[in-house]
């Protein structure tokens, strides 16, 4: 099936950018950059390129929130095609770790989200059965996954009228990782009552009922997951595994190989007098081997993935990329963030696992259960489109062509940029804030330190300006509530340090003030300045004031680039008779889980809004877990559960005090 785009017709710079990208990719350019200004509709451009080329596509986003937003947009643009969402399936994740200085072992603790797990299986099923597939993914796409050849080869084909003895069918379901549960039928499970089998594919939302007559399949139908009502008749179906890590045939041979590595490593420790490490490794690994023999799996089975997938030591693991056909296309959204993220994933994972191996918690082969190195990622992709308003050095150095998308479909211009002296800057700033407040507009102010932000906010409030500080410790709910209050006019000015994070594209903001603009560094680099300037690009009166005693090189380049874009936009509007208008964007209510900071419920949200809030909290929880701030991660997990309960219309679960209890062994 071909891709069928059902979105708005391209406008502004979109047609030119689409044609440029398609031409470059058809000419065989391996790396191409789409340099698209904020608000120019880069998603529509990506969609039209995918439609024109007709190739499966992977769109990588830097975090779960942006991935969810992109997936929703692509589903609207391609309602007849397979748009899949592939992120980590953990609601709560605490990686296995060891802190030698404290002799503290932290066992892996995780809570899997069954809906996200279903979406992951839906992704791999789609990739193996059709070509009209767009996968929107997070960095989870470069982490280990099962062997796609095994996943494809082990599927089960059931057809009406064909012989299939009941016991053979049950045995095959167990081989594919499906669990029997005659009470609770959910994705990845099946139940059997007499000659009726009900199977819930791991990637579907509705189970399949198979009715046997003796050894023959008499009837196949799809049924309602709750009522059991027959929805439609099926001539047959293909069932893919319920797990990406299948126990291969010849399991005993694999276990012998693991045991061989174990005794070599035990001997290594004993020769160095590290008896404790040897004993620890022996106990843990023998326990895992026994679990694998009896149950076919064990906690942390992914650490033995090298043996199960037949990979050689040091060889890259199978990942989602291996499920794509060879000619697939990759888009790296917000590439100035995504590229460094891809470059850094391997090193962080290796450092944590190396400690576990060195102290006898894991075999050296566990190091092969890892994300891809950046160079390995590039080896697996044939063509990449970098998408960003401010492409990084890697993108610009390697791209055979840079395609610009400067003109917005709305006709809005990049904001006016003015450099102002630091003398009396606060008084000048207050005058600007008051002027905009009188017109019903808002102001964003960015400073360099927490102390400066706190002192400036206090000073503004003391002088009658309704200002708030966007504190770095605010969680997702408080942050969204603060932005909502700004948009509703409860206050007129928001002071912050890093205004580059998502969620700050506020149409009511007509002034962005950057203090200490000439202090070069991460938040005052050319790329950061252009991104911050873009925060005023959704208002027709948008202005940016740079307070500085001198014009730094970064400032000069950012101003020149903004002025260049603005000149192009003005010329286009003049030629086409377009009058820019401020973006109209609905102000969404913010909801908090019950008992959260004793805050009252503000308003009921739609299911889509609730899911967006949950995605934001999941991102914060991951970040807390990666920073080893497990108390905060546990609190965020409880908040997520409360929101999910509200989404499902049930009573919120009780929070787990202090997180889950952890066992040692």
UniProtKB/Swiss-Prot annotation:
Q: Which segment of this protein is annotated as the motif Beta-hairpin?
A: 89-112
Every Helicase C-terminal domain range: 425-591
Superkingdom per UniProt: Bacteria
Q: Which residues bind ATP?
A: 36-43
Decide whether keyword Lipid biosynthesis is in the record.
no
> What domain notes does the record hold?
The beta-hairpin motif is involved in DNA binding.
What is the annotated quaternary arrangement, including any partners?
Answer: Forms a heterotetramer with UvrA during the search for lesions. Interacts with UvrC in an incision complex.
Additional remarks: The ATPase activity is stimulated by single-stranded DNA. UvrB is stable up to 80 Celsius degrees.
What is the name attached to this protein's record? UvrABC system protein B
Species of origin reads Thermus thermophilus (strain ATCC 27634 / DSM 579 / HB8)
Q: What is the lineage of its organism?
A: Bacteria, Thermotogati, Deinococcota, Deinococci, Thermales
